[in-house]
């Protein structure tokens, strides 16, 4: 590895951009550093500060990011969480030739419970874990890279410098120093996270249990028959006490379950390890995209079995009806903030393959109205309709009556939000939450009139399998206990 990163930003172009600033502005200094593996670079650089690493695995095109030393942390415990986000973005960003979608910004997670400030949802669940509604780090300095990544490719080391705090020359020097400091941390840092725990770990156990989950399914089906909802996503939580470091779990998960929205967030009091397949919202300028997933089949053991499962998924009347309903819901959500006539479905009902399951996926797009902000766009689609149901407000109220505990980060978002307001937010499904040496894994299923309760419970365990296996590979117990409690 070189002793320092090679500067890619032209100093004269940077000074011109900084000197032309007429409003609070950040300007980008970029350097390049070839590495073997971005995650290995993250492990060396992370240290003890709040940090994150996002990547697109499995061969998908995209961008990866990591940050290891935030300028500050944002946390919201009550109403106004999305206002906190909006207040932190909107700067005029001078990219100075940088093509990275989010060259610095806010990275972290949003809780499903932000929905309580967007809709009138009765607060009938408990919150024993005491998690905030939002936890984001403000990262002016990050590393980014193109996916898929080939060993020897460049990391883009980026500093988004607030130029109004410096002279143009001083701003460039500050950015140069920041990217070289990150390069030094990558070169000299210690990647160790400690040995696997010596104590005997325990398997995952469902907090609810099979019988209670199946009872939840039947209660939702009663509500469907009464006309209160058409479809609802019902979940339960699996818990496993384990001292395994989340970095080790994420490293195992990268191999067992590559996903387009994978990441680890190591923040005060809570760690997230995510392998989400689902995009909640992407904003690029005024262009908006969401990609709802609705419809699941287990992978086959052979290519022929996979092909048969794909065909069965596409042909299944229940899955087709559920998918169509949720695509319509997402079209309606984007329509709340999009220019009239701009909402479209350019990709409908494709089948995407993951390590354990196949999914039906569609793409819905729109163009954000000039009068609407990033906060408005997030509020329009949050939380995702595929993990609530339709109609969304009434269904979220029903979910609250059947689920005993708050969801927290589950079905919220893992967020990358640029200082300019461009953003990428996944839905935090297939996500482990670690708090106080216990891993929590919440999994759910979409319930419709003709769902089979036992089959829906089995589907939730299929969705959990890759993450349960990853914890086992890292030193925990890679299974769900056969005997689980029955807590309605």
Swiss-Prot record:
Catalytic reactions of this protein: chorismate + L-glutamine = anthranilate + pyruvate + L-glutamate + H(+)
Top EC class of this enzyme: lyase
A single GO molecular function term of this UniProt record: metal ion binding
UniProt pathway: Amino-acid biosynthesis; L-tryptophan biosynthesis; L-tryptophan from chorismate: step 1/5
Entry cofactors: Mg(2+)
EC numbers, comma separated: 4.1.3.27
Membrane-spanning residues: none
Binding site for L-tryptophan: 260-262
Note describing how the cofactor binds: Binds 1 Mg(2+) ion per subunit.
Entries under SUPFAM superfamilies matching the protein: ADC synthase (SSF56322)
Pfam families in the record: Anth_synt_I_N, Chorismate_bind
Residues engaged in binding chorismate: 295-296, 410, 430, 444-446
Keyword tags: Amino-acid biosynthesis, Aromatic amino acid biosynthesis, Lyase, Magnesium, Metal-binding, Tryptophan biosynthesis
Extra facts: Component I catalyzes the formation of anthranilate using ammonia rather than glutamine, whereas component II provides glutamine amidotransferase activity.
Self-association and partners: Tetramer of two components I and two components II.
Protein's UniProt name: Anthranilate synthase component 1 2
Gene name per UniProt: trpE2
């Amino acid at each position: 590895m070189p002793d320092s990163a090679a500067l890619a930003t032209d100093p004269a172009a940077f000074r011109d951009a900084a000197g032309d600033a007429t409003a609070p502005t950040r300007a980008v200094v970029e350097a390049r550093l070839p590495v073997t593996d971005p995650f290995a670079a993250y492990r060396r650089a992370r240290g003890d500060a709040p940090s994150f690493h996002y990547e697109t695995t499995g061969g998908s095109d995209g961008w990866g990011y990591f940050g290891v030393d935030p300028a500050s942390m944002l946390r919201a415990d009550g109403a106004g969480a999305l206002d906190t986000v909006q207040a932190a973005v909107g700067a005029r960003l001078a990219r100075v030739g940088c093509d990275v979608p989010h060259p610095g910004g806010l990275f972290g997670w949003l809780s499903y419970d932000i929905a309580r400030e967007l809709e009138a949802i009765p607060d009938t669940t408990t919150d024993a874990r005491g998690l905030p509604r939002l936890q984001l780090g403000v990262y002016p300095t990050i590393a980014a890279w193109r996916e898929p990544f080939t060993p020897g490719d460049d990391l883009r080391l980026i500093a988004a410098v607030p130029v109004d705090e410096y002279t143009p020359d001083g701003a460039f020097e500050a950015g140069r120093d920041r990217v070289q400091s990150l390069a030094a941390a990558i070169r000299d840092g210690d990647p160790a996270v400690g040995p696997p725990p010596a104590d005997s770990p325990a398997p995952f156990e469902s907090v609810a249990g099979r019988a209670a989950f199946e009872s939840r399914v039947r209660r939702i089906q009663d509500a469907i028959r009464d006309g209160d909802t058409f479809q609802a996503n019902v979940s339960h939580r699996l818990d496993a006490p384990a001292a395994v470091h989340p970095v080790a779990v994420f490293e195992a998960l990268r191999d067992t379950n590559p996903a387009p929205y994978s990441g680890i967030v190591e923040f005060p009091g809570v760690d997230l390890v995510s392998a989400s397949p689902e995009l909640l919202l992407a904003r690029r300028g005024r262009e908006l995209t969401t990609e709802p997933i609705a419809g699941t089949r287990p992978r086959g053991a052979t290519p022929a079995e996979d092909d048969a499962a794909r065909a069965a998924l596409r042909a299944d009347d229940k899955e087709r009806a559920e998918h169509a309903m949720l695509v319509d819901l997402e079209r309606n959500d984007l329509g709340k903030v999009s220019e009239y006539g701009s909402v479209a479905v350019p990709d409908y009902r494709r089948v995407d393959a993951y390590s354990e399951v196949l999914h039906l996926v569609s793409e819905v797009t729109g163009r954000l109205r000039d009068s609407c902000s990033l906060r408005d766009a997030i509020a329009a689609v949050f939380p995702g309709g595929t993990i609530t149901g339709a109609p969304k407000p009434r269904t979220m109220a029903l979910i609250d009556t059947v689920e005993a505990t708050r969801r927290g980060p589950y079905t919220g978002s893992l967020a990358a939000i640029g200082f300019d307001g461009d953003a990428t937010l996944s839905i935090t499904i297939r996500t482990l939450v670690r708090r106080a040496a216990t891993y929590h894994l919440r999994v759910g299923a979409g319930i419709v009139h003709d769902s089979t309760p036992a089959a829906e419970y089995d589907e939730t365990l299929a969705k959990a399998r890759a993450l349960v296996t990853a914890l086992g590979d890292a030193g925990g117990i890679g299974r769900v206990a056969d005997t689980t409690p029955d807590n309605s």
